[in-house]
């Protein structure tokens, strides 16, 4: 009898396997009637010390000259992407149709999926923050290192950079961002979890800032921001935010739901900030400023005069 009571007590003390797998965000636990694990209760890797997201103190990030420009392959190709409501976010399936290299990455990486995090408030929808400032949204483009590119056996067995995530902060602007319109318009077709649809034809490049804004970014090693929180991500957080019209941003929380009953609006799908610990954040070096347009015109005559004086 004592043994039976002991086993019952032990099973009651442990969450069930289904409960452990049913993770959620704080807003879901506050709004719904079903039990789920909020971020502070996520277990396993989520309790380790190299987690994401983090606050980036921009003045403490050290310049690394090896962090050069990125090269985007397939990003400019127009596609009819599949987009789905996965119960935690909206996700575009990229299916290895694009890749990245450069940017200080150790190898080429294949694009797997794109998803976003957001709020209905302009100051709490991003996962990462810059100098303590959060933004309205954050877009993650998730890539996986091409197979067979690990430098040694140990790295292949336990890679810390198997996944490369490009993180773009998003703020509210006054103009409609036409590049995001196909995605925003598709949201009406996927209000419930497990629903999917096809977007109007667009390219990944349509979602990105101008090329010059992609030169300034921060880099650190961290984790996935959702369970299983694997610590195998090389993060790139771009300094310059993307701008969307306020109505475009609000469409995500107005049209998407966490539950099939459509009672809990999908918003605040954000993991709290994690400690940086002993890790180092590095940043790309600012490129030199181009010469003012009039200066080259002046340099020609000046050099001619100097040369003439030298030849006398």
From Swiss-Prot:
Protein name, UniProt field: Carbonic anhydrase 4
Subunit structure: Interacts with SLC4A4.
Propeptide: 285-312
Residues binding substrate, per UniProt: 225-226
One Gene Ontology term, aspect cellular component: cell surface
UniProt GO BP: bicarbonate transport
Residue stretches making up the Alpha-carbonic anhydrase domain: 21-285
This enzyme's EC code(s): 4.2.1.1
Keywords attached to this entry: Cell membrane, Disease variant, Disulfide bond, Glycoprotein, GPI-anchor, Lipoprotein, Lyase, Membrane, Metal-binding, Retinitis pigmentosa, Signal, Zinc
A Pfam family per the record: Carb_anhydrase
Active site: 88 (proton donor/acceptor)
GO molecular function: carbonate dehydratase activity; zinc ion binding
Main localization, broad class: membrane
């Amino acid at each position: 009898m004592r043994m039976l009571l002991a086993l019952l007590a032990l099973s009651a003390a442990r969450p069930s396997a289904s409960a452990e797998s049913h993770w959620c965000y704080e807003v879901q636990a506050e709004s719904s009637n079903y039990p789920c694990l909020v971020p502070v209760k996520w277990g396993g890797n989520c309790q380790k010390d190299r987690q994401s997201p983090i606050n980036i103190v921009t003045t403490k990030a050290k310049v690394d000259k090896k962090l050069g420009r990125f090269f985007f392959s397939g990003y400019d190709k127009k596609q009819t992407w599949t987009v789905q409501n996965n119960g935690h976010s909206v996700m575009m399936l990229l299916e290895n149709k694009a890749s990245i290299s450069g940017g200080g990455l150790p190898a080429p990486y294949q694009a797997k999926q794109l998803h976003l995090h957001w709020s209905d408030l302009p100051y709490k929808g991003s996962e990462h923050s810059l100098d303590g400032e959060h933004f309205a949204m954050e877009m993650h483009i998730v890539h996986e290192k091409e197979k067979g590119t690990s430098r040694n056996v140990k790295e292949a067995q336990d890679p810390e950079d198997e996944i490369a995530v490009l993180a773009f902060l998003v703020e509210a602007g006054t103009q409609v961002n036409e590049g995001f319109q196909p995605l925003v318009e598709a949201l009406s077709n996927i209000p419930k979890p497990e629903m999917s649809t096809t977007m109007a034809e667009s390219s990944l490049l349509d979602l990105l800032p101008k090329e010059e804004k992609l030169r300034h970014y921060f880099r650190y090693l961290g984790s996935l921001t959702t369970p299983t929180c694997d610590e195998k991500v090389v993060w790139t957080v771009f300094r310059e935010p993307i701008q969307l019209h306020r109505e475009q941003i609000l469409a995500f929380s107005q049209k998407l739901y966490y539950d099939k009953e459509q009672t809990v609006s999908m918003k605040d799908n954000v993991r709290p900030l994690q400690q940086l610990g002993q890790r180092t954040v590095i940043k790309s070096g600012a490129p030199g400023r181009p010469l003012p347009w009039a200066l080259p015109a002046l340099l020609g005559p000046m050099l001619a005069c100097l040369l003439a004086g030298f030849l006398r």
